[in-house]
Amino acid sequence: MSIAAAPLTLALSKGRIFEETLPLLAEAGIGVVESPESSRKLILPTSDPGLRLIIVRASDVPTYVQYGAADFGIAGKDVLIEHAAGQAGRLYQPIDLNIAKCRLSVAVREDFDYAAAVHQGARLRVATKYVQSAREHFASKGVYVDLIKLYGSMELAPLVGLADAIVDLVSTGGTLRANGLREVETIMPISSRLIVNQASLKTRGASLQPLLDAFQRASQGQADSNS
């Protein structure tokens, strides 16, 4: 009697990345049976019995892939940079999927003269979830900062005097404007990447590679449509 192989596991987070991954899965002929928004389940089947999804926090996707609890996953460049800090090895990132695009930016209150503060060599307090990216950015510019790690409601920090500036993801800038903030620098463009457990690629490559190829085709289509 043959024993069926366990399904491949794809780690995803709820929200924009999940929604923008659906067309990529469709490119491979795979449909999602249940939505994480309407289901309490954290392990979701797909129309392909050889693939299941696990729904985790965005910041946890690289950890699940690194330790083999997921064969592959999709995570933002911002998350991957923070995950790589303090990690001995690097995750295999074969494909930029060109989804969930935004930018990592510095923002301040409308009435704060950021350029003057930087020019005068002031030591700035900066609130962010993206400590590694912020540290590298300000160090490269020779700006002295004290970094304050927050996990949410970043826009509040300058308004109540906790920080002079924030480093956060920006899409349209609407949330910044609604809270009386403005962008002053773009640190880097952000998009989501496909990441793969290297052991899975070696041991389950025959099953995994067709999916990777389908993601590659779909991501190229995304890039072509945006060019």
Swiss-Prot record:
The keyword RNA-binding does not apply. It is found in: Cytoplasm. Its EC number is 2.4.2.17. GO terms for cellular component: cytoplasm. One of its GO terms (molecular function) is ATP binding. It comes from the Bacteria. GO terms for biological process: L-histidine biosynthetic process. SUPFAM superfamilies: Periplasmic binding protein-like II. Pathway: Amino-acid biosynthesis; L-histidine biosynthesis; L-histidine from 5-phospho-alpha-D-ribose 1-diphosphate: step 1/9. Pfam families: HisG. Its main location: cytoplasm. InterPro entries: ATP_PRibTrfase_cat (IPR013820), ATP_PRibTrfase_CS (IPR018198), ATP_PRibTrfase_HisG (IPR001348), ATP_PRibTrfase_HisG_short (IPR024893). It catalyses: 1-(5-phospho-beta-D-ribosyl)-ATP + diphosphate = 5-phospho-alpha-D-ribose 1-diphosphate + ATP. Lacks the C-terminal regulatory region which is replaced by HisZ. Heteromultimer composed of HisG and HisZ subunits. Belongs to the ATP phosphoribosyltransferase family. Short subfamily. This is ATP phosphoribosyltransferase.
